[in-house]
Curated annotation (Swiss-Prot):
It comes from Phytoplasma mali (strain AT). NCBIfam families: rpmF_bact (TIGR01031). Belongs to the bacterial ribosomal protein bL32 family. This is Large ribosomal subunit protein bL32. GO terms for molecular function: structural constituent of ribosome. Signal peptide: none annotated. The keyword Transmembrane helix does not apply. Keywords: Ribonucleoprotein, Ribosomal protein. The keyword Transferase does not apply. One of its GO terms (cellular component) is large ribosomal subunit. It comes from the Bacteria.
Length: 61
């Protein structure tokens, strides 16, 4: 089994870990409900995408 020849220093570890980060999601405002949603997706609340209804909200009485 391979063993590292030298110990990895703190700076080398930290420089490598600077690329391990999350990016913030792009959010757009739904023109119908004014809620934030992901772009190019049907909104969960209204069911609209590009001014067309794709999901009908089912109400249980």
């Amino acid at each position: 089994m391979a063993v590292p020849f030298r110990r990895t220093s703190k700076t080398v570890k930290r420089k490598r870990r600077t690329h391990y980060k999350l990016s913030a999601p792009n959010l757009v405002v739904c023109p119908i409900t004014k809620n934030f949603t992901l772009p190019h997706r049907v909104t969960k609340n209204s069911g609209y995408y590009k001014d067309k209804l794709y999901l009908a909200n089912k109400k249980i009485d």
